[in-house]
Amino acid sequence: MGEPLRGLTSAESDLFDQGLIAFSRPLTIAEGAGPIFNEVTCAGCHNVPAVGGFGTRRVTRFGIASTPTAPFQPLEHLGGTLLQDQSFDLNCRETIPVQANHTALRGTPILFGAGLIEAIPASVLIDRANNQPPGLVGRVHYKIPLETPGGVRAVGRYGWKGGIPTVESF
């Protein structure tokens, strides 16, 4: 969030303001928060130097480490790689699955300009991945957006190694 881009139309400024309010407003259980979470507002993690920035909060990621014969396994069937360290009910507190043999602390990423990243056509990202200079091995990751379960896979743009396709899913 931070500050809006210069030159926005009145309608675009209104959208920015609505986003800032939504980003800062605590989510409720009725709106889909919980039962496990890291913070009840997006700004609870993304807040330095302003709402939407990076943060001092660290999160724990986990999975099964890659080997020469198998890629990293994110344990999605067990809830994915992010440990949600808070809950509305202590009986459903999340823990790192015993299957995980790799954990890492990650910093909160900055989100300034995240909407601009989503505006880049998927074809541009795919073309860039397919035409990299020698020695670079970036890959396009495809995931189904959380807001359309059972929908079509989309190009990942956010999160660790582009594993999240939309700002809303993030």
Model regions and ranges:
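Periplasmic c-type cytochrome electron-transfer domains
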Residues: 1-170
